A protein has these predicted regions:
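Active-site cores that bind ATP or allylic diphosphates and position pyrophosphate for catalysis
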Residues: 163-308, 314-319, 368-371
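Short, mixed-charge aromatic SLiMs
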Residues: 105-115, 300-304, 352-360
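Alpha-helix initiation and N-capping motif
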Residues: 114, 139, 162-165, 177, ...
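Short, surface-exposed acidic
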Residues: 129-131, 289-292, 339-345
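Cationic, low-complexity basic patches in intrinsically disordered or flexible, solvent-exposed regions
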Residues: 20-21
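Non-catalytic terminal extensions that flank enzyme cores
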Residues: 26-73, 92, 97, 192, ...
Length: 371
């Protein structure tokens, strides 16, 4: 089986993909930003032509990390840890940070919560270099990407409901979503016509085990090491647009990371299972693959994952308790092993302590206490 691997050698080049993707359509000026990104010069889908390739090796382009919070509630300590690791990793490599507000879902379209997120990041001292950008302003780019996939015959309408998927007792992918077995992949015209009485979702075809090509995705995570997933058996055809018209997370983040020149994605290990799908989309759309680094989750003493819904150690409570960002970050650094003790430290002061070797020691989730 042919494998698609995350790039290992990079050279600086100009990311002109947003203009290529848009074709002759009208695209908002903010979306069409030419950003310097690192791309694998040996990748088969490099976005520039061979004539544009440099004749001499180019210096590695600067690291570009990102914050990508969803304004669905106040940040909790786990969100702070994720943003802190992304910031420290980029800054320790002399890189920059892009802030993107992921507000595609209606429940996330709350300007007051987005404003609170921005205020909390500023209070923590986790400054960013570009943004904030809002996904609800970037729908034209997602539509263009989906159109390319449709024109290539890679998508199909899916009329399955959640209840039907769960009733089928399908096994689940690593992120908890049912592995789709292709019930709507080859509908007859008559069945499709009858099913169209309700709005369909849109699914992306993945190679079947019989295709003998591009079925296996491999990449190396900075924390969890070598990863491998057979799309057909461990994932199945996946959503790129929901039945309510909302673009799926997998498509939106791939489009945004490429357009914003992101070269390093740092996020919680609960999203590790999403990475093969995103790499597959990058391959289909001819986009660069960033480096991925997934970090352990922070857990409450009773073993639960911290959540916005339960208001576990939310930042409002933490700001009131610790008083200063230095006190909070110093305590968090001690809890997670980034720095010794609980000495108050600013984000800038933690840069010298940060190491991915330390994060790798905590592959298991980390239990934190409010003490």
């Amino acid at each position: 089986l042919t494998t698609i691997k995350a790039p290992s050698r990079w050279s600086g080049t100009r990311n002109v993909w947003p203009q290529q993707l848009a074709g002759h359509g009208s695209v908002s000026p903010t979306a069409l930003r030419a950003i310097l990104v690192r791309m694998d010069i040996n990748a088969r889908n490099i976005a520039t032509t061979a004539a544009d390739a440099p004749t001499t090796p180019a210096a590695p382009a600067p690291v570009v990390g990102r914050f990508a919070p969803s304004p669905s509630g106040r940040m909790h300590l786990g969100n702070v840890f994720s943003c802190l690791c992304a910031w420290l990793s980029a800054r320790s490599q002399g890189g920059s940070i892009v802030l993107r507000i992921e507000d595609l879902d209606d429940r996330c379209k709350r300007p007051e919560l987005a404003a609170q997120l921005i205020d909390d990041l500023a209070w923590l001292g986790l400054e960013w270099d570009e943004g904030p950008y809002y996904q609800h302003d970037r729908l034209d780019l997602y539509e263009s990407a989906l159109r390319r996939l449709k024109d290539a015959g890679l998508t199909y309408p899916c009329f399955c409901t959640r209840a039907e998927l769960h009733a089928a007792s399908a096994p689940h992918a690593s992120d908890g979503t049912p592995i789709y077995r292709g019930a709507c992949r080859s509908l007859s015209a008559e069945v499709a016509r009858r099913s169209a009485l309700r709005a369909p979702a849109t699914r992306l075809r993945v190679p079947t085990v019989d295709d003998l090509a591009d079925d296996v995705i491999e990449f190396v995570d900075r924390t969890y090491g070598a990863q491998c997933e057979a799309l057909a058996t461990e994932c199945g055809d996946f959503l790129v647009r929901r039945s309510d018209g909302v673009f799926a997370y997998q498509l939106a983040v791939v489009v945004d990371d490429a357009a914003m020149g992101v070269t390093e994605v740092v996020r919680g290990c609960d999203l590790l299972g999403s990475t093969p799908r995103q790499i597959y989309l990058q391959h289909l759309l001819g986009l660069p693959t960033p480096h991925y680094a997934h970090i352990p989750l922070l857990m409450a003493p009773d073993g639960r994952r911290l959540s916005k819904r339960d208001r576990d150690l939310d930042l409002g409570e933490l700001r009131a308790r610790f008083g200063t960002p230095e006190a909070l970050l110093g305590w968090l650094a001690g809890q997670t092993g980034i720095a010794p003790g609980t000495t108050p430290r600013s984000a800038e002061q933690l840069v010298e302590h940060f190491s991915w070797d330390v994060i790798r020691k905590h592959r298991e989730n980390i239990t934190v206490t409010a003490e």
